Structures are given as structure tokens and as C-alpha cells.
Amino acid sequence: MWPTRSKALITSAQSFGSWRGLAVCLGVALSLFLPVALHSEGADPAAARVNTLYDALLQVMKQAKQLGLQGRYDKLTPVLAKTYNLPLMSRIAVGQSWDALSAPQKQSIVTAFTRMTTATYANRFDGFSGESLEVLQTVDQSNGDKLVKTRIVQTDGTILALNYLARKTGNDWRVIDVYLNGTISELASRRAEFAAILKSGGPEALIASLNKQGDKLLKGS
């Protein structure tokens, strides 16, 4: 199911965070995110957030063998918590069913989703071969969000466009979705996946599925 390390960056982008399988998102048409203005990545706070993520990923990749899987997980846990609004992403991925869940169920889903996401990064970013992770520009969206455009350049010259949708939370900017090749929404994919599980087994089945995925990734498989 998963590729070798040489393909890890591109597969990671395809699977949230793989970054695993997550173009319309958040229940609105993509047309609502029409660009208003372009910015270079230098002074933009949303771009700075993604730059911090990429700096941390490169550091972990270069130290991957010394850190080991658990060490990579521990290093990336605080970085991903600051980069992504994982509670909001969990709620959006669950969709309309969210309001019917109990508070403990909501917390269990957020915890399991966060763990699975972090485990995915730790599992896949397991070495460095000269890849380049580049933040290009930020595009203001009409609803106040920002789209941070980036690319991943493999050593063989393969280029993957990877865009991050960021939203302001208080005084901070957090990523709420990732778009592969500029259009494929990670959250939209997650929402479809979660809906199928919720329909067949309810919230407890979703929690179990997320925990199972996290367990598998943290075992290195």
C-alpha cells in the first residue's frame, strides 16, 4: 500500500501529512476561494507557518536514522500541533454528524486523528536524499483565508505542487487543508472516508479505525 522511501515525499503529500488520502472542501465550492491578492512568502504569517513546518521536516529527515520512528514522532508532534488546526480539521472531516456526537466522542476523534496524522509524518519522512521543500507565495482568499503555494522537488527533478489552506485562529494562522497538485483536497478525501465508516459503524468505529491506522504506522508498517 505504501511506497518506498524514494517516493515518500510525493506519497506523503497524497495522503495528508502521506498525508493519507485528505476540489471542494469545507462544504463550499472552490470558487469561494477566489484569489484577492498575491504575496511573496517572506513577511506573510501563513507562509511563515508552512516554512516552519518545512524546516522541521528537513531537520527530521536528515536525522531520521538517529531519531528512529518514535523519535521522529516525538519531534514532529509539537510542530504539527502548531501547523495544523487539527481539532477543526477533525470536525470538518466528520461533517454534519459532528453535532450529534458526545463531548467524549469528539475528543476521542480529535485525539486519534492527531495521533494518526503525526504517525503518518513520522513513518514516511524517514530519510533525506537532497529533496527541496520550497514555499513560493501566498494568495489571499475572498473569505479571509490564505492559500500558501509550495512545491517539493525530488532529486530526480520531479516537482510536486502542494498548497496549504490556512485560516486565522485568534492571532495565529493554522493550516486547515492541503491540496495536492493544487486541486485535490485532503479534507474532502477524509470526509468521504469518514462518512463511509460512520454510516457502517458509527463514531466508535471511526475512533477504532483511526487508532488502528495510528498503531500500524507507529509499528513502522
Where are the regions a protein language model picked out?
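Sec/Tat signal peptide C-region and signal peptidase I cleavage site
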Residues: 34-42
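Surface-exposed, polar/charged faces of alpha-helical domains
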Residues: 44-48, 59, 63-71, 100-104, ...
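Surface-exposed, charged secondary-structure patches
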Residues: 118-160, 210-221
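Short beta-strand edge/turn micro-motifs at domain boundaries
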Residues: 159-189
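Low-complexity, intrinsically disordered terminal/linker segments enriched in charged
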Residues: 179-221
